[in-house]
Amino acid sequence: MKRWSALAGLAVGLVLLVGCREVRVKTLAAGTTTVPGGNQILIVRDAVALGKLGIHAPVHFKGEFGVALLMGPHDRTGYKQIVESIRANPERVRVVAFEQAPADGGEPSPPYRSYTLWIVPNSVYRRGIRVEVVTPSNEPIAATYLP
């Protein structure tokens, strides 16, 4: 009986360890794009979709996918995104982020949006997971689901 409970304990421990694996998410690019729109979080699965966003980055779509956070539009130069945290659990990914206005007020410019592009391994892609972006004060910015 003791042997059975020891094996059961070991099995539970292994399941917990496998479930707690660390995922390496890389911030590949940050910048601006002139593609019109508002605040969005987008899942990018191919080079064509990435190009339509006006983002040019060397993503290897065979083994990874992109997550792009676009914020704006702005009509003054100098806005940039600050990402405070990214937390994930089996139901959702929560990004806490905001935009920092230029200290000098910026210069007038044609409308643009700031973006941050993350690269995520395909091995963690789970259809239906909610991806949400909120401000540090918990106000919603954008949300989507992994298609």
Regions of interest found by a model, annotated:
Residues 1-8:
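Bacterial N-terminal signal peptides that target proteins for export
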Residues 8-16:
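Bacterial N-terminal signal peptides
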Residues 18-147:
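Exposed, flexible binding/inhibitory loops of compact, secreted disulfide-stabilized domains
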